[in-house]
Amino acid sequence: MGSRPCALGLFCCCSSCFCLCCPRHRPVSRLAAAVGGAAAVPAVVSGVTGLILSPSQSPIFIQPTPSPPMSPLRPGLDLVFANPPDHSAPLGVTRPSAPPLPHVVDLPQLGPRR
């Protein structure tokens, strides 16, 4: 995939970035016209998430950003599965190390309801 001449006479390195003025990526050129001279705007181009880098009114390039590695488990679940529950005590029996439950306090009535 080497460098190809761009529509504006520049070169497009399609392997590393997406040139929005290149005929190969022309469907995205509407996005470039809408963005104008923005410094860095998140965008999705052909399924690749990247940043639109445009320091001036020159052609806009989108450089793909690396995606974080996907974990098979959601964060926090690894701790749940790492420490399985201890079933040594039958259900309904409290352990001696557990703190006692607070006593229930009856609150006085605030007055008759109207």
Curated annotation (Swiss-Prot):
Family annotation (Pfam families): HEV_ORF1 (PF02444)
Cysteine pairings via disulfide bonds: none
Region (Induction of host SIRPA expression): 6-22
Region named Membrane association: 1-28
Membrane topology reported for the UniProt record: Lipid-anchor
Region of interest (Interaction with the capsid protein), ranges: 48-72
Keywords: Host cell membrane, Host cytoplasm, Host cytoskeleton, Host endoplasmic reticulum, Host membrane, Host-virus interaction, Inhibition of host innate immune response by virus, Inhibition of host IRF3 by virus, Inhibition of host RLR pathway by virus, Lipoprotein, Membrane, Phosphoprotein, Viral immunoevasion, Virion
PTM statement from Swiss-Prot or TrEMBL: Palmitoylated in the N-terminus.
Stretches of the chain forming a coiled coil according to its record: none
Region entry Hydrophobic, spans: 6-22, 33-53
Region (Homodimerization, and interaction with host AMBP/bikunin): 72-114
InterPro entries referenced in this protein's UniProt entry, alphabetically: HEV_Orf2 (IPR003384)
Region (Interaction with host HPX): 28-68
Chain span(s) of sequence motif PTAP/PSAP motif: 96-99
Cellular component terms (Gene Ontology): host cell endoplasmic reticulum membrane; host cell plasma membrane; host cytoskeleton; membrane; virion component
Region: Interaction with host SRC, HCK, FYN, PIK3R3 and GRB2, residue numbers: 95-104
Keyword Disulfide bond: no
Chain spans, region Disordered: 91-114
Family: Belongs to the hepevirus ORF3 protein family.
Binding partners and assembly: Forms homooligomers. Interacts with host SRC, HCK, FYN, PIK3R3 and GRB2 (via SH3 domain); binding does not activate the kinases. Interacts with host AMBP/bikunin and AMBP/alpha-1-microglobulin peptides. Interacts with host HPX/hemopexin. Interacts (when phosphorylated) with capsid protein ORF2. Interacts with host TSG101; this interaction plays a role in viral release from the host cell. Interacts with host SIRPA; this interaction down-regulates the phosphorylation of host IRF3.
Function: Small multifunctional phosphoprotein involved in virion morphogenesis, egress and counteracting host innate immunity. Plays critical roles in the final steps of viral release by interacting with host TSG101, a member of the vacuolar protein-sorting pathway and using other cellular host proteins involved in vesicle formation pathway. Also acts as a viroporin and forms ion conductive pores allowing viral particle release. Impairs the generation of type I interferon by down-regulating host TLR3 and TLR7 as well as their downstream signaling pathways.
Name under which the protein is recorded: Protein ORF3
